[in-house]
Amino acid sequence: MRTKRLSSMVALAAAICVSAPHQLRAGGPSTSASVRGVVHFEGKVPVSKPVSMASDPVCAKQHAGPLVTQEVLADPKGDLQNVVVFVSEGLGDRAFDPPADPVVVEQKGCMYQPHVLAVRANQKLQLVNDDATSHNIHPQPANNREWNKAEPPGSKMEESFAREEVAIPVKCNVHPWMRGYIAVFKHPFFAVTGKDGSFDLSNLPPGTYTIKAWHEKLGTSSQTVTIGANETKEISFVFKGM
């Protein structure tokens, strides 16, 4: 009887191991493959539109000169900023716990800083109002809960998004020029390009992946890569002027 009971327990444990998602942490020698590269813009960079803050003198006086929109930012070499690069396929049923530390969005000079950011699903998003005027933060998701909250000067608040989405537009109902984007992922393999257009997706398990690059105005581009253990693949994305 004890032998039958032990066999049943072993079978049950095996079934649980098979059916449960793989709980993995990024990092470690067995998952040290990487995909890195640069995102380029090809063609004439669109002229940024002027931003008028005349409706709120508190905002206007924080800037020495006129401001322009941040829609397409590329340097003279064509390195493209504010592109979200991420793994879209290939991770299977692997699951990853969200980080405990929040991602911070500042409202400073009546602008969202950063303009484009990425967070994990269910990771805390801390919204900080550094301005001496009130804001009203209003994300407009397609797959997540929509919310619309006022934030007085000098205050902080926390929110989160439960589902993957690339990317959620965010506006301020008080200041119409304030626009930003938040990309949400259930895994840690993503990056947002800085001024040099570079990205680095590190600590990937070996495998074949679809890598996508998303830009708020230029759309989405994708390619497939296969990487082995401890291997680094160099790739690049090129967006062309519309």
Where are these predicted regions, by residue range?
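Extracytoplasmic copper-binding redox domains, predominantly the cupredoxin/blue-copper superfamily
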Residues: 24-242
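Bacterial N-terminal signal peptides
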Residues: 9-19
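N-terminal secretory signal peptides that target proteins for export/translocation
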Residues: 1-4
